[in-house]
């Protein structure tokens, strides 16, 4: 056996000895997350309103709109509205990946039709209409669908004479829709 074969066989042994790395899905579905001093149970983090319990750290972890509304209104104590969704990819945008594929994977990842959730709930017996964006949906950038959701929330608040609360988790307009995202 020559020296190249020995190196290749040694490499194969090392590969088989190393366990497979966890996928993003495995990490997302885990009961644990990490912060300043190592692993933290997600249950403990949730009890502390998604802020690291370590006194020196106090890092605010990213939360999605549902988690935010659970904190704001109480667990599942609000009504989620289905908002109108305009046509996907009006400009037929493609760069390294098509915009339709990006939307499809963002919808699968978040379980939302667009990057903004519109709800109605009560705080101290005051009815409130609220919207919140989800950073996991294409960086919470605004497009026509998010604009429609935002407008729907405002119209609902005006019609029902409720305060309107907007929680933004990102910024900017989505380049894949160009000026359409501004309308």
Language model features with spans:
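Terminal-region recognition feature
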Residues: 1-183
């Amino acid at each position: 056996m020559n020296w190249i074969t020995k190196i290749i066989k040694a490499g194969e042994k090392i590969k088989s000895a190393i366990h497979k790395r966890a996928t993003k899905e495995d990490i997302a579905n885990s009961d644990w997350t990490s912060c300043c001093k190592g692993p933290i149970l997600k249950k403990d983090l949730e009890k502390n309103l998604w802020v690291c319990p370590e006194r020196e750290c106090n890092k605010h972890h990213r939360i999605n709109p549902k988690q935010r509304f659970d904190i704001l209104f109480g667990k599942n104590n609000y009504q989620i509205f289905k908002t109108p969704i305009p046509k996907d990819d009006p400009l037929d945008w493609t760069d390294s990946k098509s915009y339709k594929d990006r939307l499809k994977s963002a919808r699968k990842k978040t379980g939302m039709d667009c990057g903004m959730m519109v709800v109605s709930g009560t705080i101290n017996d005051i009815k409130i209409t609220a919207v919140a964006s989800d950073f996991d949906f294409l960086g919470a950038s605004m497009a026509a669908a998010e604009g429609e959701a935002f407008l729907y929330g405002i119209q609902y608040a005006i019609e029902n004479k409720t305060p309107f609360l907007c929680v933004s988790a990102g910024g900017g307009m989505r380049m894949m829709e160009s000026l359409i995202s501004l309308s």
